[in-house]
């Protein structure tokens, strides 16, 4: 029961991580990428060979938002699960 003995300031610091946009947790859950909507003509006019050159990794998906370490997010989520609601 170590989590219940933490000071309230620690609980608040952990709760600050809740405000991360859902796009960081689940790709596609956040706002849709605007590049496809704003520039459909450019994507159609570009030949497929240059598209393959743009992708450094063959199977990599472009995700909306900044690149985030999944391991860090999973650690944060596991911390959030065990914060008792009584101390909020």
Swiss-Prot record:
This is Small muscular protein. Preferentially and abundantly expressed in heart and skeletal muscle. The gene is SMPX. GO terms for biological process: striated muscle contraction. Belongs to the SMPX family. Disulfide bonds: none annotated. Keywords: Deafness, Non-syndromic deafness. InterPro entries: Chisel (IPR029268). Changing residue 78 to N: In MPD7; uncertain significance. Plays a role in the regulatory network through which muscle cells coordinate their structural and functional states during growth, adaptation, and repair. It is linked to Deafness, X-linked, 4: A non-syndromic form of sensorineural, progressive hearing loss with postlingual onset. In affected males, the auditory impairment affects initially high-frequency hearing. It later evolves to become severe to profound and affects all frequencies. Carrier females manifest moderate hearing impairment in the high frequencies. Residues 22-66 are annotated as: Disordered. The lineage of its organism: Eukaryota, Metazoa, Chordata, Craniata, Vertebrata. GO terms for cellular component: costamere; M band; muscle tendon junction; nucleus. It comes from Homo sapiens (Human).
């Amino acid at each position: 029961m170590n989590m219940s003995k933490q000071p309230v300031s620690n609980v608040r610091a952990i709760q600050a991580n809740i405000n991360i946009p859902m796009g960081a947790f689940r790709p596609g859950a956040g706002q849709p990428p605007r590049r496809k909507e704003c520039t459909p003509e450019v994507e159609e006019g570009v030949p497929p060979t240059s598209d393959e050159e743009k992708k450094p990794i063959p199977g990599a998906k472009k995700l909306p938002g900044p690149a985030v370490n999944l391991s860090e997010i999973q650690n944060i989520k596991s911390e959030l699960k065990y914060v008792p609601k009584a101390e909020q």
